[in-house]
């Protein structure tokens, strides 16, 4: 059986950049955000269950999920947010495990699970090791303000809604320092991969 590595970070620490580097190195990666979209596509049991609970008004004219509308509803209502998680989380988990199984059956030695809220969702048991993409909190704040065109207050609010990056780094098995150049980050990524995969 191959190894599964959980990849996580915080809101603007560069996890997507590292995720792309991993895939460019030829290592399979299963993205929790993509899985979350797949399990509520038109015609899925996930979407049917969401409609049964929230009503037809959360659908667009073409029968797909109106994410903006659903987002508005769950943002204001904790009970509804928990219900949505109850519907989607087990399906996302199954989707990711099935994808991993296919990679291992195809002979892959290493699979990454890209899970933004890995610690917050208590999904540590899904993976063998955890890698956190880290930057200083100052760099994280600066990048988020620039990337999303946010005020300092809005950016801080978004960062504070998640577990702090330093706490995530303490919980991790490995930390990739993405505070400097992309070249340095890539070197760390490739060194990490070589620990587990001999021919990469």
UniProtKB/Swiss-Prot annotation:
Pathway: Cofactor biosynthesis; coenzyme A biosynthesis; CoA from (R)-pantothenate: step 5/5. GO terms for cellular component: cytoplasm. The keyword Signal does not apply. Its EC number is 2.7.1.24. CDD domains: DPCK (cd02022). GO terms for molecular function: ATP binding; dephospho-CoA kinase activity. It is found in: Cytoplasm. ATP binds at residues 12-17. InterPro entries: Depp_CoAkinase (IPR001977), P-loop_NTPase (IPR027417). Residues 4-200 form the DPCK domain. Keywords: ATP-binding, Coenzyme A biosynthesis, Cytoplasm, Kinase, Nucleotide-binding, Transferase. PANTHER family: BIFUNCTIONAL COENZYME A SYNTHASE-RELATED, DEPHOSPHO-COA KINASE-RELATED. Catalyzes the phosphorylation of the 3'-hydroxyl group of dephosphocoenzyme A to form coenzyme A. Belongs to the CoaE family. This is Dephospho-CoA kinase. The gene is coaE.
């Amino acid at each position: 059986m191959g190894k599964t590595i959980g990849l996580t970070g915080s809101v603007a620490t560069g996890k997507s950049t590292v995720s792309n580097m991993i895939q460019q190195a030829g290592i399979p990666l299963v993205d929790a955000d993509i899985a979350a979209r797949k399990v509520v596509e038109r015609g899925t049991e996930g979407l049917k269950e969401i409609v049964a609970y929230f009503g037809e008004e959360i659908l667009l004219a073409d029968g797909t999920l109106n994410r903006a509308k659903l987002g508005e509803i769950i943002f204001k209502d904790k009970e509804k947010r928990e219900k949505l998680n109850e519907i989607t989380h087990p399906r996302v988990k199954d989707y990711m495990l099935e994808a991993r199984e296919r990679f291992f059956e195809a002979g892959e030695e290493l699979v990454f699970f890209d899970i933004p809220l890995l610690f917050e969702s208590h999904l540590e048991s899904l993976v063998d090791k955890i890698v956190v993409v880290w930057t200083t909190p100052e760099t994280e704040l600066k990048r988020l303000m620039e990337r999303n065109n946010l005020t300092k207050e809005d950016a801080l609010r978004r960062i504070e809604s998640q577990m702090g990056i330093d706490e995530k780094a303490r919980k991790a098995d490995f930390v990739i320092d993405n505070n400097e150049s992309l070249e340095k980050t890539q070197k760390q990524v490739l060194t990490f991969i070589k620990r587990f995969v001999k021919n990469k």
